[in-house]
Amino acid sequence: MALSQLQCLDNNHVNWRTSEGKAEFFYSEEQRLALEALLSQGVDAFHGVVKGENIRDFLSELEMSRVLSRLEPFDPDCCHCRPDGEEGDEGIGEQDGAQSLEYWPDRSDCSIPDLDLGWPEAFAYRGVTRATVYMQPPVDGQPHIKEVVRKMINQAQKVIAVVMDHFTDIDIFRDLLDAGFKRKVSVYVILNETDVKYFLQMCEKAQMHKGHVKNLRIRTVGGSEFYTRFSTKFKGSLGQKFMFVDGDKAICGSYSFTWSASRIDRNLITMLSGQVVETFDRQFQDLYLLSKGVSLKNIPMENEPEPEPVLQTATVPTAVSESIAKKLINPKYSLVKTKSASDTGAEKEKNSSNCNNMATKPKPKPTEQPPQEQKHPALHNMEKANMFDYLPTWVEPDPEPGSDILGYINIIDPTIKNPHLSQMNRIKIWDTSQATAQFLLDKEQELKQTECQKGSETSQEQTSSKVETHEPYSEKEKSGHGYSETTTVKKEEESSENLVHTSKVDQGRMEHSPSKATSLTQVSQQNQSMDLNEAEKSPSQSRGSKASQTSQGKESMPSNSSGVTLGGQTVSNTEESSVASPGPYEDLEKEPVKDTVDELEDTSIKDPPLENFESLLKSQHLIIPSNTEPVTGPPVPKPRTLPVADFINMKNAQNANIGSPSPCLADSIMPSVNGLDTEGTEDTTHSEKAEEDSDEGVQYFSSGSGSLPPSSSSSVSEEYYLTTSVQRRNSEDPVYNGEFFPVQRKMSEGHISRGSFLSPFHFRQTVMDLGQMENGQRRNPGLEQELQMAMADRHPMHGNEMIYSMEPTQGKPVYPFGTNGLSPSYERLQMHRQAKNPGRARGREESTGVLRGYPQIRNPEGLALRHGFWGPSHAANQPSPLTSNPMPAEHPSTPFGIPFSKLAQAKHLKTKMGASNLDSRRRGHGYLGHKDQ
């Protein structure tokens, strides 16, 4: 029914009276009367109504002819069910269902269209609208409109919906068939009812088969219908032309899918994408609901062929450089063989045939030529690697019982399939920790032959002039118990040119470090008297003393210019110049190794007691070998050292009868007393953590270098690790194994640490540090002798009790390391320090956390944290983790035997003197006064 008629049936609609000259003019009752006159009476009646109603002539001759040709009688029962066996018009398919005879129809205007092949989901927003217009003929280099349509069909993946008035282009139709059959794309086509016969003729020419119809739906629809009062009607035609693809693209315009429209007619199309496509989506569903199906059963079709496999084009790899191509091919992969897909498929076929137990002949497979291996041009002339040369070797753990051999490495010739032991090259793997027994025997025989060749002392002097390189291969030092096991060293004679070169290097070293050689020589002279007594009891030590005397007599020689005597042994900066006799090796070879306790008892009975520093120097614990030549001997295990503190505690009882030292300090030199230098600054030292032994209650300390943390089970000697240089530590560093006292110094000042060797005074100080330079001069060696004798006079003490005397005297200050008073030069030092910083004593007296009247140590992490060192009240009030019963003395003193009362008097003297003796030449790095800050 026409729109004007539908509007008249609406009760709420009001036809506003408008003239023909307005844009809103649409419905006209006069035009309806003229049209009915044309359909009932003809053309003359039409013109008579137009003149009588005084309206415009709105129909052309072409339109009059089309309306008259489409006129048909209206039968109200034409839409009902037809009797069985009655067929409808040609071209109308069975898809039209039977109409209902009831009042309420089965179908309504709002029915859902039957899109059985699928339809893309509706999206709330389809994106930004974009439009592109293409012309026919093309302009500005644009592609042809037919090319644009075909490309869009070939790119479709989901659905293609076409609404067309004339569809006779066979090329476009073949593209639709291929999309539906090969790519399984749903294809819907809606055509004009009057032109469907031309479409069916094209289908006969397209050589269709039954597979093309599976994903193809063809339907027809016409225009709106106009009903008259004389039971007649006529229908319009479908003039819409658009194509909807995948729910996101659409093409519309004047272009019809015909040859003439793409070649000779002028048309245009508009490609749309985005949100505007939603209009085409709804319009197609409405047209599909109103359309009728078209049957294609009268079109001759062939059977559906087998689907052709989709040929995937082999991608040619891009050319790579020669260097990369050589890296990609690794010869390791030639040893790996994996099963291909064909091999696994053949195995499955065999298994299935065995299960079925059917004797079926296998189908002959077409012979396929093996694909040629593709090689990079850079790899054509390369040799194939023999992977047997790259096979790894392995260790067979089959050594003989009781031997030092851990196993063998077998090297097998790859050309021999089953090699025997005679055809293998074996490499023995020895245990380095126990493989020195045979080596000692060989070296002992060599040394015996060497001693036999030396007939007299003249021959010995000739051989000693030659440089003999010694390589220590095994050394076990136990300095804590006076026990030392040394093995022989390997000797290699060098040419005379190397002798001259070595002597020059040694002389240069002595020139650059005169202080070090002087200090070591002075210490050795102090220990010569003790070595002579020891030489009478032990023949092995007598040899060492003779060697030391011989080396002292030859200090002028270039070969021995770099050697120094320490504890009866001659030590060189490059190598040890003395040759040990084979005596110790016989004892080491014949006598088995006993327990440590037995060895300690034997050594304590045979050997006389040694001084504390002398034992350390004798063990050469801090001598750093400067040998630069490569080691050719067997690997040397690390020497094992025992704690020094145990040895000192055990020998304290035997050192009580030794005479007190006589101080011989020079008046012109200000010595370093109580950790203070000549400028009034404090020699700050780091204190090591002490671990408490739960069984014995004895403190153990490591003798390792500063680069390693202290440990009770240290097996590291400073012969293998250099001492660390001066380091700085801030006050924020935590202190473990003790109470934390408040920091009494500036936070910005760094703390200087010297070395890491833990001396018997419980702070780090190496033997080499005793000979440091002060004001360009050497420290007085008398101080070293005084400290050594002070160690000898002390009583045996344990734990923290070592800092207090067990038997304090009345009216006399007690010194834990001796009974000597203050040295003459100490008062001059205190007066000099008081003149240096007059305001320092006042700041110390006002400080809290220590005893009033006693100086406060600048380093709270050093000696101040040792319980009972500087504050006996702390040791009395607070429990110490190191000892359970500390016994503070009535008059505590410093470790160097200086009472605190004397230090307090020196402070007052310093304050009285004022700034008269201020030294402006040098400013110390210690605590600054209030004015200096």
From Swiss-Prot:
Statement: the UniProt record of this protein carries the keyword Metal-binding: no
Biased composition (Low complexity): 702-716
Single GO molecular function: protein kinase binding
CDD domains: PLDc_FAM83G_N
Subcellular localization(s) per the UniProt record: Cytoplasm, Cytosol; Nucleus
BP GO terms, sorted: signal transduction
Segments of this protein annotated with the region Disordered: 339-375, 450-716, 870-899, 911-933
Domain of life of the organism encoding this protein: Eukaryota
Stored InterPro entries: FAM83, SACK1
Skewed-composition ranges (Basic and acidic residues): 467-480, 503-514, 590-609
Biased composition, class Polar residues, residue ranges: 452-466, 515-531, 538-580, 651-660, 875-886
Pfam families associated with the record: SACK1
Chief place of localization: cytoplasm
A GO CC term attached to the entry: cytosol
Family from the record: Belongs to the FAM83 family.
Task of the protein: Substrate for type I BMP receptor kinase involved in regulation of some target genes of the BMP signaling pathway. May also play a role in other signaling pathways.
SUBUNIT field: Interacts with SMAD1 (via MH2 domain); in a SMAD4-independent manner.
PANTHER family reported for this sequence: PROTEIN FAM83A-RELATED (PTHR16181:SF29)
Protein name: Protein FAM83G
Organism per entry: Xenopus laevis
